[in-house]
Amino acid sequence: MTAALHIGHLSKSFQNTPVLNDISLSLDPGEILFIVGASGCGKTTLLRCLAGFEQPDFGEISLSGRTIFSKNTNLPVRERRLGYVVQEGVLFPHLTVYRNTAYGLGNGKGKTAQERQRIEAMLELTGISELAGRYPHELSGGQQQRVALARALAPDPELILLDEPFSALDEQLRRQIREDMIAALRANGKSAVFVSHDREEALQYADRIAVMKQGRILQTASPHELYRQPADLDAALFIGEGIVFPAALNADGTADCGLGRLPVQSGAPAGTRGTLLIRPEQFSLHPHSAPTASIHAVVLKTTPKARHTEISLRVGQTVLTLNLPSAPTLSDGISAVLHLDGPALFFPGNTL
């Protein structure tokens, strides 16, 4: 199967400062990839290089086997067959929704019957057929983003690029628009690359996620694999919350840390030092009379919240604060048992 997108060893610097450093990844036909990372890690620059708005220093980019950038090739934006949706939509204020969508076809008019049919199909797909005669200033933020997607889809591009398209919307609207836009992409069979800073969004909607840091891709994997088997501590902490401790491995598949001796997931040899990470949902708290226990704790303080209970505990010399979705009613100062569900993650060489 020919990859919908292939990036090989892509690098880009601005004024001798590396922004992209040896980026390589591939995207299957119909796949939705989310690129996540902290601000300034190079996500948007990567999208701009794919679109042709920035020229990489080195590397190759191909779409469905067709080279669009290499040492000897640099196709202009209009010849790359890419759709691009940015944060604010960027619609033409003097054009109606219909004409903005038609602009994606190159002439802004939709002259032929085939073009008009395509425009109407994209308006229907994105749920804005009834808005065809309106101007951008008459639309909500969510409606403007739907128009931007319709315009990007109109010329039937090989790939859609979306740069944080939901970040300017309020939470409730963001959720609805996000679900509708991704459903439209899947219904149209389009491969797409989303840039996002929202890890929950990526975990819920991506087929795969690429985690970036300082111009490099730390890991590309399915949401489940990335969360359960992160390649390193940076990827683990970016994609989800974690409680970390310095630790040392034992020969029996355990590690010694501030909570005592815990089972770990690691193939490193005994004696290896590094960082142990536990996901918050792995913890559960039980009365001291619980039949099984590996971690004995003293409850310091419990604070009920809207969706969870915040509990401060002392385990030996370690003070730990957990947000548990459900917890037994325990008085401050009482002894309790902290149960760990499954092994902790261990990252060699990552010392705190």
Swiss-Prot record:
Q: Where in the cell is it found?
A: Cell inner membrane
**Pfam families with a match to the protein in the record:** ABC_tran (PF00005), FbpC-like_RD (PF22443), FbpC_C_terminal (PF17845)
Query: What protein name applies here?
Result: Fe(3+) ions import ATP-binding protein FbpC
- Topology class, membrane: Peripheral membrane protein
ABC transporter domain: which residues?
A: 5-239
UniProt organism field: Neisseria meningitidis serogroup B (strain ATCC BAA-335 / MC58)
Query: What family is reported?
Result: Belongs to the ABC transporter superfamily. Fe(3+) ion importer (TC 3.A.1.10) family.
Question: Do you know which InterPro entries this protein is assigned to?
Answer: AAA+_ATPase (IPR003593), ABC_SmlMolc_Importer (IPR050093), ABC_transporter-like_ATP-bd (IPR003439), ABC_transporter-like_CS (IPR017871), ABC_transpr_FbpC (IPR015853), FbpC_C (IPR041230), FbpC_RD (IPR055223), Mo/tungstate-bd_C_term_dom (IPR008995)
Q: How does it assemble?
A: The complex is composed of two ATP-binding proteins (FbpC), two transmembrane proteins (FbpB) and a solute-binding protein (FbpA).
**Taxonomy of the source species:** Bacteria, Pseudomonadati, Pseudomonadota, Betaproteobacteria, Neisseriales
Q: Briefly state the protein's biological role.
A: Part of the ABC transporter complex FbpABC involved in Fe(3+) ions import. Responsible for energy coupling to the transport system.
EC number assigned by the record: 7.2.2.7
Q: What Gene3D superfamilies does UniProt report for this protein, alphabetically?
A: 2.40.50.450, 2.40.50.470, P-loop containing nucleotide triphosphate hydrolases
Main location class: membrane
